[in-house]
Each structure stands twice: as structure tokens, then as C-alpha cells.
From Swiss-Prot:
It comes from Mesobuthus eupeus. Residues 40-70 form a propeptide. One of its GO terms (cellular component) is membrane. The keyword Secreted applies. Expressed by the venom gland. Disulfide bonds: none annotated. This is Venom antimicrobial peptide-6. The modification Phenylalanine amide is found at residue 36. Its main location: secreted.
Length: 70
């Protein structure tokens, strides 16, 4: 009975370690993708790609002012 309990605890700890390392590797991969991705290497203006026919030029200018320091 002791060996089964020990084995169960070992498996639980092992599975926790695997899931944590997978999360860390995923976060590192996502960070590298964001740093070295195609879009991040270019200087892109996000407001340039905003398209909504209901927005006027004054609305876009106001949005740009609001998003300057964001």
C-alpha cells in the first residue's frame, strides 16, 4: 500500500512538472515569436490598418490622440 501511494504521489508530481515546463516553454516560444515575427520586425502603424466606413477622419484623429500614450 505504501508503494502504491508513493507511486501515485510521484506520478502527480511528475505530471505537474511536465505541465509547468510545457507552459514555460510555450511562453518562451510565444515571446520569441513576438520578438522575431514578421510583423514585429516591421515598423507598423496600427491606426493605418484600421478600417471602418462609419468612422470619420475626425474620429480617427481622436482615436490616434487617445492611443498615443497607450
Amino acid at each position: 500500500m505504501k508503494s502504491q501511494t508513493f507511486f501515485l504521489l510521484f506520478l502527480v508530481v511528475f505530471l505537474l512538472a511536465i505541465t509547468q515546463s510545457e507552459a514555460i516553454f510555450g511562453a518562451i516560444a510565444g515571446l520569441l515569436k513576438n520578438i522575431f515575427g514578421k510583423r514585429s520586425l516591421r515598423d507598423m502603424d496600427t491606426m493605418k490598418y484600421l478600417y471602418d466606413p462609419s468612422l470619420s477622419a475626425a474620429d480617427l484623429k481622436t482615436l490616434q490622440k487617445l492611443m498615443e500614450n497607450y
